[in-house]
Amino acid sequence: MREMITLESLCRALADEQIAAEELRERALDTEARLTLLNCFIREGDAVSQFGEADQARKGTSLWGVPVSFKDNICVRGLPLTAGTRGMSGFIADQDAAIVSQLKALGAVVAGKNNMHELSFGVTSINPHWGAVGNPVAPGYCAGGSSGGSAAAVASGIVPLSVGTDTGGSIRIPAAFCGITGFRPTTGRLSTAGIIPVSHTKDCVGLLTRTAGDAEFVYGLLSGKQQSFPLNRTGPCRIGLPVSMWSDLDGEVERACINALSLLRKTGFEFVEIDDADIVELNQTLTFTVPLYEFFADFAQSLLSLGWKHGIHHIFAQVDDANVKGIINHHLGEGAIKPAHYLSSLQNGELLKRKMDELFARHHIKLLGYPTVPCRVPHLDHADRPEFFSQAIRNTDLASNAMLPSITIPVGPEGRLPVGLSFDAPRARDAFLLSNVSLIEKVLKG
C-alpha cells in the first residue's frame, strides 16, 4: 500500500481492478505479521479471523476494499471492545459505532482494533496489559496517544486509514510522533455514537492518514460533500501564530516548524504573531475539569448502553496503568470535582468559543498555525512520566476546548525524529481547513 501515492489513487486502482481487494488484504496481514512487535493491534484471537473481507455487494462504492482499522474504544460488531483495559478483556461488541457503519457503507474493510492508552487516559499508548505501542518510524521511541495504535498502523503501512478519538489531542499527538496526518473535525461533525467516551463535551471522532490530501478525500466522503473536481482553493492565506504555542520549544521542533513557515512564506502565505495570553488563561480552566467530571457518568452510561453487566468498579479495580489508576482513585475520592466548578468551566467554554471567533476576525486570519507538540518525541523509557501529559497536550487542547477543526502534518527532516505542525480553522470550516492544508502539504513537499 505504501507505493500508492494517495488513498484516492488506491480506491481508483481497486475500482479499475488494477489491484484485487484480497491482495490488499493479504498484504496488510503480511505487514502486520512482520511487525507484531509494534503492538498496534489488540487481537483477542488470530488476525486473519478478525480482518474482514471486501463485501461484493458494495463493489463500486467509494472506499470498496480499503482496509480501515479502529481504535479499541470504538464498537465494531463481532470484535472485542476493551478500551485498552484488562477489565474489559473478552467483551464483544454487538453493534457497530456510527462511524463504522458509515465506512462499511462506503465499502471499507474492517482491519481490526488498535491498541491505545488505557481508557484513553494518556498520551503514550504504553499499555501495561496489551503492550506498549511501538513507533514504526522511530524505533524505541513513543508512538503517542491515546490513539497510538491507530497512528502506528498507518505509519507502518498496514492500513492507509485508521479512525481514532481525540479529547485533548489523542489523534494529533500520535500522528505527530509517528510522522503522519491526524485530523480532528469540528466537535460533533462525526457521530460519537457507539464509542466508549471520556467526555461528551470534548470527545471527537477523527482520522489518521498518511497525508492531508487523504484526510480531505475521506472526510469529503463522510460528510457527503465529496466532489469529482478539486475544491476551490483560496491560495496562500493569512495565518496566525499564537505566541504561547511557539514558546519554550525543543530546538529540533522549533527548527523544523520555522523551516516549514519559511517555505510557505516564499509562496505567498502571510504569518502574523497573535498575543493569546487571555485565551491561554481561559483555556486552562477547561483542560482537566470538564473531562474528569464527565468521565465517570459518561463511561458508566456508555457501558450500560452496550450491555455491560459487571459495573464500572469491576473495570477500575483492574486498571494496570499506575497514572490512570491514580487519576481515577483521586477523582473518585477527595479530588472529586464539585458541580459548581464544572458548570463554571462549561460557561468558560462558551466564552472561549466567542473569544476564538473574535480572534480570527480581529486579526483577519484564516488559520492558526503552531507546533503540534512543543517537545521532541520521547524515548519509551522516559515517556511515562506524569508531567509529560500536560506538556504533550499544551498546544493541542485549545482546539478541543474551543471545538475547532484541527489537523497536524509532518514537517520533520528525513532521518530525524518526527515533528508535527498543526493548523486550526474556525468552527465548521472543516472543508476549508483540509483544502488549505492539502495545499500547504504540496508546497512543503515541493
Swiss-Prot record:
The active site is at residues 71, 146, 170. GO terms for biological process: auxin biosynthetic process. The keyword Hydrolase applies. Pathway: Plant hormone metabolism; auxin biosynthesis. It holds the Pfam family Amidase. Keywords: Auxin biosynthesis, Hydrolase. GO terms for molecular function: hydrolase activity. Its EC number is 3.5.1.-. The keyword Hydrolase applies. Signal peptide: none annotated. InterPro entries: Amidase (IPR000120), Amidase_CS (IPR020556), Amidase_dom (IPR023631), AS_sf (IPR036928). Hydrolyzes indole-3-acetamide (IAM) into indole-3-acetic acid (IAA). PANTHER family: GLUTAMYL-TRNA(GLN) AMIDOTRANSFERASE SUBUNIT A, TRANSAMIDASE. This is Indoleacetamide hydrolase. The gene is iaaH.
